[in-house]
Regions:
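Metal-dependent amide/peptide-bond hydrolase catalytic core
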Residues: 1-151
Length: 151
């Protein structure tokens, strides 16, 4: 009997690499990079990364980013996040079970140029091409990115 938890983990593992880059084909194609005005804004923007690290009990950001590069990642790069995952027996004690289902909630933070409907389609195609046609994708909500004026 297949283990649904492992199946889901293997599928999720294809979505993002160890450098935090989303690996879905064509995911980055429509992104409009920050212009010079936006980059100038990042340079001047006050962001206390050390306080964020301390508040979260960690000693560095992903890829050891800091300064303008960190602010650019926070504001102008999309993300893929696993918000929650559930499978099998998680009660007290132990049981030898092979999970028949696995469920996770993932979310994508999109940036200027990206379209929520297109990203869902790209995710489905990505999973299908890698043999994960059995993984169901349910869209609960989706919003296109909002771009605020830096002035």
């Amino acid at each position: 009997m297949p283990n649904a938890a492992w199946r889901l983990i293997w599928a999720l593992n294809t979505i993002k690499d160890e450098n935090d880059r989303i690996t879905i084909d064509h995911f980055y194609d429509d992104i409009i990079p920050p212009d010079q005005e936006e980059m100038d804004f990042l340079e001047q923007m006050n962001y206390d990364g050390q306080s964020v690290l301390k508040a979260n009990g960690i000693d560095h950001f992903i890829n050891n980013l800091s300064g303008t590069a960190l602010k650019e990642k926070l504001l102008y790069e999309p993300t893929a996040n696993i918000a929650g995952i559930e499978s099998g027996y998680t009660g007290k004690g132990s049981k030898t079970v092979i999970p028949s289902y696995a469920f996770c909630k993932i979310d994508f933070r999109l940036v200027k140029g990206q379209d929520a409907e297109r990203v869902v389609k790209l995710l489905r195609e990505h999973l299908d091409r890698r043999g994960f046609t059995d993984i169901e994708v349910i869209k609960y909500s989706g919003k296109n990115p909002y771009h605020a004026d830096t002035k």
